[in-house]
Structures are given as structure tokens and as C-alpha cells.
Amino acid sequence: AKTTAPSVYPLVPVCGGTTGSSVTLGCLVKGYFPEPVTLTWNSGSLSSGVHTFPALLQSGLYTLSSSVTVTSNTWPSQTITCNVAHPASSTKVDKKIEPRVPITQNPCPPHQRVPPCAAPDLLGGPSVFIFPPKIKDVLMISLSPMVTCVVVDVSEDDPDVQISWFVNNVEVHTAQTQTHREDYNSTLRVVSALPIQHQDWMSGKEFKCKVNNRALPSPIEKTISKPRGPVRAPQVYVLPPPAEEMTKKEFSLTCMITGFLPAEIAVDWTSNGRTEQNYKNTATVLDSDGSYFMYSKLRVQKSTWERGSLFACSVVHEVLHNHLTTKTISRSLGK
């Protein structure tokens, strides 16, 4: 298949307005090949409130979306940028999320109907996307995996959406469905989340959502199941800070994860048993032998390192014993 660079579209609330104390912004990365792309907000400095959906393959090209929820005091008074990189096509795009009206203008006067923003006519009616559960939710028995069906571009004139769920063609009725009215183009977005059994996903059962709406000529069905293919356990290595960095007040610990199949993996860090937040993971990268690798980098204060804190990189993958492995490092271990 031909390498194709993505198009990047900012998604903003209707008329730049907000409801309540928060606002949700979005970024749509469309029409690229091959995987992966990396998407960050404000070059990674904005990580709280971010929800990035898995990439979806349609007609040979991938589409990925991400949203971030911030306080209405933050945007639009502060700049928020969606940063997208597609290594295969050497593409880097920084898309600033701009309000649709001047910041000084009151976009939606109180007690008045929200005016429609300039948006293309919805010729095709609603679209439906289905997303797999998060891999950590599937592999850790204490967590609750969900398959999600998202219906977008639902007209306010035809707001009723019927969503039915099936597991191996047997209908189930345990999904939780919500409608969101603050979509970026004056439409509705309906999200239906189906709680599933861990083993149902791992054994390859097929999950189907069936969507009907008056604007659709016939119901839309989307199915998903765990892909089949070769499996290989990851090798995990924790690397101490480079000597050149040790003179600084803050430096990096690196977790290198190599040789795994399939690509779905979860990586996080702890220090002295407490969850760390100051880390960044790369996307998974296809290696020359057909397996995948990735890196995770944790920023550490020199003072914490010198106190002898114990840092641990934890990796969740389906081929590992108990689906989990942890590698540790400290100042004494790193010498």
C-alpha cells in the first residue's frame, strides 16, 4: 500500500461557546497510511483530560481522533495546539484550535437558541464507529473492559438513535448509552459502551452494534473482535540515566520494550509503589523482524534519585505470565 500523509482537522465546540466550567476540544487525523501517528496536545504538556481513540482502518486508510477537556478559563484565552506526527510520510502538523467567532464576541447569548456554526451539510447522515476495549482493562482481572460504539453527525431534527448490541449474534442489553449535545458542528454524538467479559474478548467472540435512525436508509452494523495472529512476549529493559544528564536537576529513566506481538500493550511507572505521572510513551513501532517495539521515558528529579527511590516500569501484554511484568531500577541498582 502507498504511504499517505494525514489530513488534520481541529474540532471546536459550537460557536466557540462552552457549557458550564469545562469545554471539550477535538482533533481528527484522517486518511493516513501506514500506522502509526503520534498525537499530543501542546507538545505533550497537556495530558490531563485527554482521550485518544484507537485508529480505525477504512478503505485502506487510517483515521484517529483525540479529545481534550479543559476549563473554560483555559480556552480560548490560552493557546491549545494539536500536534500530529506521521513518521512514514515525514509529516508533522501543529494545528491550533481556534474559536469560530472572535474571542471578544459573546458567541451564544443567554436564553437564546444556539446559532448554528458554518459547517458542511450532513449529506450522508450519521456515521458509526466501533472501538475495542483498552488492553489493560482486558488483561487485568480487577478492571472492567468495554467495547464502545460511537454514532456521530446525528441531526437535532432526528435525535432518536436506537443501538442494539450482539455477542456472537446473541442480543445483550447491558450497554450504557449517552448523548452529547456539545459537538463541534451543531450535531449530536451518541456513545454506547458495552461491558464485556475478559475471556469473551480473549477467546475471539464477535461484538456487533446495530444502529438505526430516521436519517439512515437502513440500519448500520459494525463488528469487532480480537484479531488473530502470531504472539510473542515482550522483552523489557530499564536503562539508567545517561551520564551526560546526571549533572542536571532532572533526568530520564528509559524503559525499552522489544519483540512483542500483537502490538497492543500498556506501560506505566511507579516510584516506591506510588503511581508516577511524569512519563511519556512512544507509539508502538513495527520492527524489521515483524514484531513491535516501543520506549517509555520517565522524568526524575535528581534529589529523588539520590535518596535511593525505587522506580518500576510495569508492562501489560497478553503473552506475559499473569499478563504483567515489572522491571525496577534505583540509584544503587543503576550503578
From Swiss-Prot:
Protein's name according to its UniProt entry: Ig gamma-2A chain C region secreted form
GO cellular component: immunoglobulin complex, circulating
Coiled-coil intervals, chain numbering: none
The keyword Transferase is annotated on this UniProt entry: no
Keyword tags: Glycoprotein, Immunoglobulin domain, Repeat, Secreted
InterPro entries the UniProt entry points to: Ig-like_dom (IPR007110), Ig-like_dom_sf (IPR036179), Ig-like_fold (IPR013783), Ig/MHC_CS (IPR003006), Ig_C1-set (IPR003597), Immune_Resp_Modulators (IPR050380)
Lineage: Eukaryota, Metazoa, Chordata, Craniata, Vertebrata
Listed SUPFAM superfamilies: Immunoglobulin
Gene3D superfamilies: Immunoglobulins
Note: The sequence differs from that of the a allele, from BALB/c mice, at 15% of the positions.
GO molecular function: antigen binding; immunoglobulin receptor binding
Domain Ig-like: residue ranges: 6-98, 126-225, 234-330
Glycosylation sites: 185
CDD domains recorded: IgC1_CH1_IgEG, IgC1_CH3_IgAGD_CH4_IgAEM
SMART domains: IGc1
TM helices/strands, residue ranges: none
GO terms, biological process: antibacterial humoral response; complement activation, classical pathway
Domain of life: Eukaryota
Protein source organism: Mus musculus
The keyword DNA damage is assigned to this record: no
